[in-house]
Amino acid sequence: MAATAFLVLTYLLGAFPFGLVVALVGRGIDPRLAGSRNTGATNVSRLCGTKLGVLTLVLDLAKGLVPVLCARAMTDSPVFLSMVAVAAVVGHMYSVFLYGKGGKGVATTIGVFLGGAPIPALLSVAVCVAVIRVSGYVSAGSLTLAVALPILCAWLGPVFLVPAAAIIGGLVIHKHRDNIARLRSGQEKSWRKDRAKAA
């Protein structure tokens, strides 16, 4: 009973649309109606500025980190910790508060694995940032992170999180299917161009 309640609370925390609230309160902009129409940190940053984008990133990351740390303090059950990890990300991606819609889950995924597998998480973030800097595309870095996480968990541990990392990575890739299509067609937006316009 307690485990079920915790999973529901984890989903609800993951589902809370911090990006929407930050954009509406900070700039009066609904990110669902502009830019990529996504409530995540990248779109909020493009629409509302870097500071509000970073705030959204931190809050979305916390949605994954806090439940996993709390779960680890409660139990060492690999199955339960894996379920908490997936619940947080699924909540962010398919929010009950947004009628089943949501973000792409990258920040929340990072938070989840910082709490459950910090070394693979940090290495995945490093690879993600490197790909973004080289390619100029945030989506390319996000996709790389989604692929790297289960591989690094399998290599460096904890191995019990590999299935959760694979499920979450697959969901992140699925959420980026439009970005993948734009990358293939050469129509994806580059953060370098966004910075040049802002300058």
Curated annotation (Swiss-Prot):
Give the residue range of the signal peptide.
none
Gene Ontology terms for molecular function: acyl-phosphate glycerol-3-phosphate acyltransferase activity
SMART domains (alphabetical)? G3P_acyltransf (SM01207)
**Keyword entries, A-Z:** Cell inner membrane, Cell membrane, Lipid biosynthesis, Lipid metabolism, Membrane, Phospholipid biosynthesis, Phospholipid metabolism, Transferase, Transmembrane, Transmembrane helix
The Gene Ontology biological process terms listed for this entry are: phospholipid biosynthetic process
Q: What class of enzyme is it?
A: transferase
Reactions the enzyme catalyzes: an acyl phosphate + sn-glycerol 3-phosphate = a 1-acyl-sn-glycero-3-phosphate + phosphate
Topology in the lipid bilayer: Multi-pass membrane protein
The membrane spanning regions, by residue number, are: 5-25, 51-71, 79-99, 112-132, 153-173
EC number assigned by the record: 2.3.1.275
> Where does this protein chiefly localize?
membrane
Q: Which residues form a coiled coil?
A: none
Which compartments does it reside in? Cell inner membrane
Paired cysteines (S-S): none
Cellular compartments per GO CC: plasma membrane
> Which InterPro entries does UniProt cross-reference here?
G3P_acylTferase_PlsY
Stated role: Catalyzes the transfer of an acyl group from acyl-phosphate (acyl-PO(4)) to glycerol-3-phosphate (G3P) to form lysophosphatidic acid (LPA). This enzyme utilizes acyl-phosphate as fatty acyl donor, but not acyl-CoA or acyl-ACP.
- Subunit structure comment from the entry: Probably interacts with PlsX.
Q: Which family does it belong to?
A: Belongs to the PlsY family.
Listed name of the protein: Glycerol-3-phosphate acyltransferase
